[in-house]
Amino acid sequence: MKIQLLSDLHLESHPDFRPQPAPGADVLVLAGDIGSYQAGSLLAERGDADFGLARFSPRHGWPVPVLFVPGNHEYDGLDFDEADARLRETCARLGLTWLERETVVMADAAGPVRFIGTTLWSDFDALAPPDRPVARPQPLPVRASPQQTPPDSPLTEQLRARDKAFRAANFYLRKTSGTRGGQPFLAQAVREQSLVCQQWLRAALAQPFDGTTVVITHFAPSLRSADPRYGLTPGTAGFCNALDELLPAAQLWLHGHLHAPSNYRHRGCRVVANPLGYARKGEQAAFAPLLEIDTASLV
């Protein structure tokens, strides 16, 4: 099966971007941040109420099935749960397959392919100094602070690292104007959503499957996907998780979020990202609009 991968098109900034189907592709994967309604959105100015997704609609001419995993920016300027419902309705109306904590199996001549999708979000613990191997099976406590733990304990160091990651993330999250239940959707709420996604993802990957497994997330599963322009800083934990122990359960992991491409193999899994990014930041040179990943090459 040949998979075309696109992410981080940010159509709110690039509304005239016109994607082309990759010749020979069997399916298109949209790995999040396709379009949003943040302040100044050109989609909103032009009256596009479909997050820019109509141009990918199989009902409007896109030639192959389209799988959509929402990114973080789809929720900008909106209530989280209202945006979620609106995105689901949009996908159903346009004929896109919604993959937020959903699994779909597609037939292929070489054998079935299972797509497991979730935004994933971030638990902000990717850079926490571990008191056990990095591939830790359980995340740190959902709610805790360094002031609640012994000052020299490994847990305190982990919580300090998380607190730094929270502060870095909240600097930007406050600008997005996203809310949930009337409250700003900030780092702690993102973490809690991430833990829900992680629990679901672990359960989905644990289900036996005789075929190829492809995971699609918006947030990255590993620090190996970190943007080399910035190195490893507290802000990196808002883009990458440290879920490397899950990689062996899949043959292919597709993601977005970072505006830097990835294409590497780790722990038996190929990890690929193909973001467009922002033109104003000079991030688009490495984007491959017709990128295809052939699952036959994963063996």
How would you label these PLM feature ranges?
Residues 1-68, 76-82, 180, 187, ...:
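N-terminal active-site segment of His-dependent metallophosphoesterases
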Residues 5-7, 28-33, 66-72, 97-102, ...:
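Active-site neighborhood of phospho(di)ester-bond hydrolases with catalytic His/Asp-centered motifs
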Residues 116-214, 221-225, 229-230:
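Active-site-proximal loop/helix segment associated with metal-binding centers of metalloenzymes
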Residues 65-147:
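A basic- and aromatic-enriched beta-loop-alpha substructure that forms the phosphate/nucleotide-
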Residues 45-52, 83, 189-200, 235-239:
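Soluble or luminal CAZymes and related metallo-dependent hydrolases
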Residues 227, 233-251, 259-299:
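Binuclear metal-dependent phosphoesterase catalytic core
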